[in-house]
């Protein structure tokens, strides 16, 4: 029986682990016999071994500098080698301090060898996966302990009984995530995330010239508790990295959710457009704009107020106004009142809009900012009442009004009452604009849809939209199902609507504060000392 081994070139005196991959290789054309058992041995770099987990093709180089491609498909159980040269037959190996991944042919786990294309299929992957799991787990465990040794000493003996017991008492550096990796090997999400994170850690250590990545957020992400994943959504990241020796390799990671880990979310924000990572601590100072592609991500109402209003001039109105389930809406999943309470705790708001008085570059204004994080910014009776009171207050004080829209439309849990808010706000706006001749600026952010678009969102004297904002009355899916027609992509983005005359201007966030200020000055509003009236707080 001939053997084909995966040589990781890992020179570790303390770690020796063997797991053999055996297959009759009589017809494997270009690959010569270099191993001790007469079978060919393929040389892999450590990082390339980690990449075996991904269903992707990656480039490898042997010690002679010759390169070839390897494809490993877990789902279809295919391992394929595509050499760029005829140099695979001359590979030589060192027999000590190396890790092998071998799987015996006892259970016919490997069959249907294709000599022409140099690939074989795995029919029974149970042995293959279990032994690959064991080797990979041992490598990661050893690496974590080795990197921590630069800070403090640790017991060098790490027996299988210690690992299987799951006890933390025997070793203060016990890594529960690494332990759990063995038992969640069939979970593709955990596998991809763990490997992707570890590779990123290795990249950081290479680029910094250091041999430890304990300071890296990725390292703490791998070797820590409390890791959770979700199956919603997907994304892909491809990175090309060059090492100090000049060799390069490709890493392709998969993220199955923008919020797949709480720790990662606290440190990084992933762009919805290009999937680039933005450092969270600097993200607010960048106004939630992606540094890589310039995409405008969603902002909370509090961040909007901080961006738009001069510091120390914000005076909120009607903060205690809350909904009391006016139509007693009942849902099989979750009662409406419970949902309201849940969103109030999550967003820190009483409802989907904040209204108040402030100054914009010294000019007193009345401003309302909707928050999409609160039930999708849906417009219920509280939202309608707060905006109506804001406009009426602006009429009494002759203030310009700015409303920042971010809404999914009317709130279905309040039925006809939510629809009546459209008429109520529009009536107040008519009195403000037509009778009092005051100035109203509407700012549309992504998304602005439904009843908000059909009412006060489009009633501004000046209508400003953010770049790439999703502005529509009905969503794309609703239109397609209603009309039974395919809607072209990009039909409901701000740029398309702007060319059709729906908006007056598209303004990025950086100069957004200055544009309304110039408009107010043009219409006769100037800086002045302003003392806001004490607002009436109504609880319903």
Curated annotation (Swiss-Prot):
Top-level taxonomic group: Eukaryota
SUPFAM superfamilies hit by this protein: ClpP/crotonase (SSF52096)
Compositional bias (Low complexity): 233-248
GO cellular component: acetyl-CoA carboxylase complex; chloroplast stroma
Single GO MF descriptor: carboxyl- or carbamoyltransferase activity
Start and end residues, zinc fingers (C4-type): 271-293
Class of the enzyme per the UniProt entry, highest EC level: transferase
Bound cofactor: record note: Binds 1 zinc ion per subunit.
Pfam family membership, one: Carboxyl_trans
Domain CoA carboxyltransferase N-terminal, chain residue ranges per copy: 267-538
Gene3D superfamilies listed in its UniProt record: 2-enoyl-CoA Hydratase, Chain A, domain 1
InterPro entries recorded: AcCoA_carboxyl_beta, Acetyl_CoA_COase_Trfase_b_su, ClpP/crotonase-like_dom_sf, COA_CT_N
Location, primary (coarse class): plastid
Region (Disordered), start-end ranges: 229-249
Keywords for this protein: ATP-binding, Chloroplast, Fatty acid biosynthesis, Fatty acid metabolism, Lipid biosynthesis, Lipid metabolism, Metal-binding, Nucleotide-binding, Plastid, Transferase, Zinc, Zinc-finger
Family to which the UniProt record says this protein belongs: Belongs to the AccD/PCCB family.
Quaternary organization: Acetyl-CoA carboxylase is a heterohexamer composed of biotin carboxyl carrier protein, biotin carboxylase and 2 subunits each of ACCase subunit alpha and ACCase plastid-coded subunit beta (accD).
Purpose: Component of the acetyl coenzyme A carboxylase (ACC) complex. Biotin carboxylase (BC) catalyzes the carboxylation of biotin on its carrier protein (BCCP) and then the CO(2) group is transferred by the transcarboxylase to acetyl-CoA to form malonyl-CoA.
Protein name: Acetyl-coenzyme A carboxylase carboxyl transferase subunit beta, chloroplastic
Protein source organism: Amborella trichopoda
């Amino acid at each position: 029986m001939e053997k084909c081994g995966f040589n990781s070139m890992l020179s570790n005196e303390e770690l020796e682990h063997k797991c053999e991959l055996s297959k009759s290789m009589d017809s494997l054309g270009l690959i010569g016999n270099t191993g001790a058992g007469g079978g060919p041995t393929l040389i892999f770099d450590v990082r390339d071994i980690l990449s075996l987990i991904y269903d992707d093709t990656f480039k490898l180089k042997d010690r002679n500098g010759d390169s070839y491609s390897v494809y490993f498909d877990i789902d279809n159980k295919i391992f394929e080698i595509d050499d760029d040269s005829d140099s695979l037959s001359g590979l030589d190996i060192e027999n000590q301090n190396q890790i092998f991944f071998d799987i015996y042919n006892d259970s016919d786990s490997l069959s249907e060898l294709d000599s022409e294309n140099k690939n074989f299929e795995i029919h029974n992957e149970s042995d293959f996966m279990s032994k690959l799991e064991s080797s990979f787990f041992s490598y990661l465990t050893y690496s974590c302990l080795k990197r921590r040794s630069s800070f403090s000493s640790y017991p060098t003996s790490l027996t299988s009984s210690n690992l299987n017991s799951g006890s933390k008492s025997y070793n203060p550096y016990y890594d529960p995530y690494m332990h759990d990796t063995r038992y969640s090997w069939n979970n593709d999400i955990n596998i991809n995330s763990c490997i992707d994170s570890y590779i990123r850690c290795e990249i950081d250590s290479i680029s910094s010239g250091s041999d430890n990545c304990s300071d890296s957020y990725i390292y703490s992400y791998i070797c820590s508790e409390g890791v959770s994943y979700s199956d919603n959504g997907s994304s892909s990241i491809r990175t090309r990295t060059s090492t100090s020796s000049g060799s390069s390799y490709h890493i392709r990671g998969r993220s199955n959710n923008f919020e797949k880990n709480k720790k990662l979310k606290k440190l990084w924000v992933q762009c919805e457009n290009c999937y680039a990572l933005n450092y969270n601590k600097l993200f607010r100072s960048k106004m939630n704009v992606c540094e890589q592609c310039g995409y405008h991500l969603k902002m909370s109402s509090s961040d909007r107020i901080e961006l738009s209003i001069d510091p120390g001039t914000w005076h909120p109105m009607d903060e205690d106004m809350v909904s009391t389930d006016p139509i007693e809406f009942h849902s099989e999943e979750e009662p409406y009142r419970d949902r309201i309470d849940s969103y109030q705790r999550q967003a820190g708001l009483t409802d989907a809009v904040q209204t108040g008085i402030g100054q914009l570059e010294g000019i007193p204004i009345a401003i309302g900012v909707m928050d999409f994080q609160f039930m999708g910014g849906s417009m219920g009776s509280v939202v309608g009442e707060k905006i109506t009171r804001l406009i009426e207050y602006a009429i009494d004080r002759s203030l310009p009004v700015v409303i920042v829209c971010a809404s999914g439309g009317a709130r279905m849990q309040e039925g006809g009452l939510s629809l009546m808010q459209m008429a109520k706000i529009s009536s107040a706006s008519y009195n403000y604009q037509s009778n009092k001749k005051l100035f109203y600026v509407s700012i549309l952010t992504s998304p602005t849809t439904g009843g908000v678009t059909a009412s006060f969102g489009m009633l501004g004297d000046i209508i400003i939209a953010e770049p790439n904002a999703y502005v529509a009355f009905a969503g794309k899916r609703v239109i397609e199902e209603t009309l039974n027609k395919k809607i072209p992509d990009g039909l409901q983005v701000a740029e398309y609507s702007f060319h059709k005359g729906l908006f007056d201007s598209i303004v990025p966030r950086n100069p957004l504060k200055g544009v309304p200020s110039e408009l107010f000055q043009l219409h006769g509003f100037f800086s002045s000392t302003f003392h806001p009236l004490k607002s009436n707080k109504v609880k319903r």
